[in-house]
Regions:
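The canonical Cys-X-X-Cys-His
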Residues: 43, 49-59, 105, 141, ...
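Extended, well-folded interaction surfaces typified by the phenylalanyl-tRNA synthetase beta subunit core
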Residues: 153-168
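Electrostatic cytochrome c docking/interface patches
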Residues: 26-48, 62, 172-201, 319
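Surface-exposed interaction/gating patches
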Residues: 166-254, 258
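N-terminal Sec-pathway targeting helices
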Residues: 1-14
Length: 319
């Protein structure tokens, strides 16, 4: 009996050590980054493409009065797992990322790891998409962020229940769902299509909202871009594959590629309605992109394969 217990204990310890090793937060070493001169204009473009200000700008009750250069964080993101509070990513050395190295920043976007603290970041920060951003663009973005003003003040901790408050478990989540690397252009497609695919799947992280998720909070790949319930449980994010865009709204309006590009500029859809809720904030960002990038996004989105996503709840009819 004693030998059996000892064997069981040894197995438990071995499994625990294996899991501990498998869930070590991954990092990008500084030695992996060759000498580079950042392009601040491109960094600003990546800032807008990624919608950084939409989440990280210090909140204001009036969205029109938000200073998009002050990235003090604090926005509450409600989810089935609890409430996440968006961190300060201003250039403040103590409360923001002013003390980060370039390798720290690349590590956060590619690996979902807070390198200086040696711990996993929650995927409420969409590193499953940001891992596809090319290195030069990550470095340009970091350089641009450092030009923005420091904002003192540390954001409160996430409000998560057990077991979601155990960050180390995210290492197992990453083993399942964090795969891939920087975007590699498809030689069979045009330069415009590849640019759109890159912006949509990388910095734009469009699938993070426009896709349903499984019980572990990961995107269901077979229904990518097919819409689903909003992360906070309020409202519905539409299907942006042809299944949704060719039968839009109550009158089954069909979107053209030109309609998509125009919508990303002014927020008005083919039915004459304007973007609201979270999408209005997205339009604030896409409107700042150049026309070629908006056209590239439109070309890629228009090429998506039709996919049937979960069905939205029936609209209430007041009697």
């Amino acid at each position: 009996m004693t030998r059996k217990l000892a064997l069981i204990a040894a197995v438990v310890v071995a499994v625990a050590l294996a899991l501990w090793w498998l869930t070590v937060p991954a990092t990008v070493p500084a030695a992996a980054l060759p000498a580079y001169t950042p392009n601040l204009d491109n960094g600003r473009a990546m800032f807008n493409a990624g919608g950084c200000a939409s989440c990280h700008a210090t909140p204001n009750d009036d969205p029109d009065k938000v200073d998009r250069t002050k990235l003090g964080g604090g926005l509450a993101l409600k989810s089935p797992f609890g409430t996440f509070y968006v961190p300060n990513i201003s250039s403040d050395a103590n409360d923001g990322i002013g003390g980060w190295s370039e390798a720290d920043f690349v590590t956060a976007l590619w690996k979902g790891t807070a390198a200086r603290r040696g711990r996993h970041l929650y995927p409420a920060f969409p590193y499953t998409s940001y891992q596809h951003i090319q290195l030069a663009d990550v470095r340009d973005l970091f350089a641009y962020l450092k030009t923005l003003p420091p904002v003192p003040g540390r954001v409160r901790r996430h409000d998560l229940g057990f077991p979601f408050n155990i960050r180390r478990l995210l290492g197992l989540w990453k083993l399942l769902f964090l795969h891939g690397g920087p975007y590699v252009p498809d030689p069979a497609q045009s330069a415009q299509w590849n640019r759109g695919a890159y912006l949509v799947n990388g910095p734009g992280h469009c699938a993070e909202c426009h896709s349903p998720r499984n019980m572990l909070g990961a995107i269901i790949d077979s229904q990518r871009f097919a819409g689903g319930p909003a992360a906070d449980g309020k409202g519905w994010v539409p299907n942006i594959t042809p299944t949704g865009l060719q039968h839009w709204g109550d009158d089954n309006t069909a979107w053209t590629e030109k309609d998509i590009a125009s919508y990303l500029s002014d927020g008005m859809n083919p039915a004459g309605d304007y973007a609201g809720a979270a999408m209005a904030e997205v339009i604030r960002n896409t409107a700042l992109l150049n026309a070629d990038d908006r056209a590239a996004i439109a070309a890629y989105v228009a090429s998506l394969p039709p996919r049937q996503g979960p069905k939205p709840p029936a609209k209430r009819t007041d009697k």
